[in-house]
Curated annotation (Swiss-Prot):
<dbReference type="InterPro" id="IPR050067">
    <property type="entry name" value="IPM_dehydratase_rel_enz"/>
</dbReference>
<keyword id="KW-0004">4Fe-4S</keyword>
<dbReference type="InterPro" id="IPR011826">
    <property type="entry name" value="HAcnase/IPMdehydase_lsu_prok"/>
</dbReference>
<keyword id="KW-0408">Iron</keyword>
<keyword id="KW-0411">Iron-sulfur</keyword>
<protein>
    <recommendedName>
        <fullName>3-isopropylmalate dehydratase large subunit</fullName>
        <ecNumber>4.2.1.33</ecNumber>
    </recommendedName>
</protein>
<dbReference type="InterPro" id="IPR018136">
    <property type="entry name" value="Aconitase_4Fe-4S_BS"/>
</dbReference>
<comment type="subunit">
    <text>Heterodimer of LeuC and LeuD.</text>
</comment>
<dbReference type="GO" id="GO:0046872">
    <property type="term" value="F:metal ion binding"/>
</dbReference>
<comment type="function">
    <text>Catalyzes the isomerization between 2-isopropylmalate and 3-isopropylmalate, via the formation of 2-isopropylmaleate.</text>
</comment>
<keyword id="KW-0100">Branched-chain amino acid biosynthesis</keyword>
<comment type="similarity">
    <text>Belongs to the aconitase/IPM isomerase family. LeuC type 2 subfamily.</text>
</comment>
<keyword id="KW-0456">Lyase</keyword>
<dbReference type="GO" id="GO:0009098">
    <property type="term" value="P:L-leucine biosynthetic process"/>
</dbReference>
<dbReference type="InterPro" id="IPR001030">
    <property type="entry name" value="Acoase/IPM_deHydtase_lsu_aba"/>
</dbReference>
<feature type="binding site">
    <location>
        <position position="320"/>
    </location>
    <ligand>
        <name>[4Fe-4S] cluster</name>
    </ligand>
</feature>
<dbReference type="InterPro" id="IPR015931">
    <property type="entry name" value="Acnase/IPM_dHydase_lsu_aba_1/3"/>
</dbReference>
Length: 380
């Protein structure tokens, strides 16, 4: 039995209706949810949360007005709204909203981040989210599962992002639509485990879940990953599945580095970057985006924030930052960006004429020092 089958209480391929333990949305998706909700329902179920993280603080009058409408709706419904404290997926974990949960849905494609807790967490559209907010339940077709079993220990400069770029690339030619990725024998810390499940959707998976004991039963594909031989990786434009060892693109000139997001904006990941930047000066625009206010607070308390500022980096308020290309570090025409986010589609971070490479915080920080993509082994 796969983890998904266990959590949904049904066999692969079956269609079931299940109660949802947590439903959440953010400032980018709530306006459409409100429209759909008002056409069909009157009261929101109690286990509903809203986060302002995508474009906050509001950079335009239009966005400010949309956020005002969300606040008015939330006030009518008694929905908690968490503003400017960080990214929804990170805060859901920090606040314990999914503790003891089995099923979580969110109006964001990276809701599977919470799969690091061992729950079935999926992103759904605005209309489906409105239904869950009104009924407290929804339907699922139990997905098939692909297992990823780690072996060995990663090298000192290899992070979860490197593993995921490798995995996404390895699965590129396998039909992953509506399949779950289940991870076993995971040697990474909890901060890094969240990166694994967060990145899963970029393989076109339905969700990602971390399990404890691997049964080997019921999986449509089994993928073994030897971390001891895995080099630092980078995903070339314009897809996360364009993964290659960093050394293959070493020397590529870059204009900006972004370290953060729901993928790599946790304390441990920013700390790794700070260790590299300590006492140095960045050669290109370097933006740091803590995933939550708690992460930012800890950066200040430990002196990491000062290290980064002294190195010439800019620290953003907690949130999504430039990942979605709407504010605080948008890519211009011809810009080459090295980012620790999860997507590098054409135009994702701004101009469709820019290029985005994806890498780990270690690779990104080192590259920021040299102004070009640099392998950790070559520059550490």
């Amino acid at each position: 039995m796969t983890l998904v089958e266990e959590l949904l209480g049904a066999k692969t391929g079956e269609v079931v209706v299940r109660e949802v333990d947590l439903v959440y949305a953010h400032d980018g998706t709530m306006p459409l949810i409100i429209e759909a909700f008002r056409r069909n329902f009157t009261r929101v179920v109690p286990r509903t949360y809203v986060f302002f993280d995508h474009v906050f603080p509001a950079p335009t009058v239009k966005i400010a007005n949309l956020q005002k409408e969300i606040l008015e709706f939330a006030g009518e419904q008694g929905i908690p709204v968490i503003q400017g404290q960080g990214i929804s997926h990170q805060l859901a974990v920090e606040m314990g909203l999914a503790d003891n949960a089995r099923i979580v849905v969110g109006a964001d494609s990276h809701t599977p981040t919470l799969g690091a807790l061992g729950v079935f967490a999926v992103g759904i559209g605005a209309t489906d989210t409105a239904v869950v907010m009104g009924l407290g339940k929804t339907w699922f077709r139990v997905p098939e599962s692909v297992s990823v079993v780690f072996e060995g220990r990663p090298g000192k400069n290899v992070m979860a992002a490197d593993a995921m770029i490798h995995i996404i690339t390895a699965l590129r030619d396998f039909e992953m639509n509506y399949k779950a990725i289940e991870f076993f024998n995971v040697p990474f810390s909890f901060d890094e485990r969240l990166t694994l499940t967060n990145f899963s959707v970029e393989a076109n998976a339905k969700t990602g879940i971390i399990g404890e004991e691997y049964s080997g039963d019921g999986y449509v594909l089994e993928l073994g990953i030897d971390l001891s031989s895995l080099p630092p990786m980078v995903a070339k434009p314009h897809h996360p599945s364009n993964g290659v060892p960093v050394e293959e693109v070493e020397g590529t000139k870059i204009d900006q580095v972004f370290i953060g997001s729901c993928t790599n904006g946790r304390f441990e990941q920013i700390e790794r970057a700070a260790e590299i930047l300590a006492g140095e000066e960045v050669a290109v625009r370097t933006i740091i985006g803590p995933a939550s206010a708690n992460v930012y607070r800890r950066m200040i308390e430990t002196g990491i924030a000062k290290v980064l500022i002294d190195a010439g980096a800019v620290i953003l308020p907690p949130g999504c930052g430039p990942c979605l290309g709407r504010h605080m570090g948008v890519a211009g025409d011809g810009d080459v960006i090295l980012s620790t986010t999860n997507r590098n589609f054409r135009g994702r971070m701004g101009s469709p004429n820019s290029e985005i490479y994806l890498a780990s915080p270690v690779t990104a920080a080192l590259s920021a020092l040299y102004g070009e993509i640099t392998t950790p082994e070559g520059g550490a």
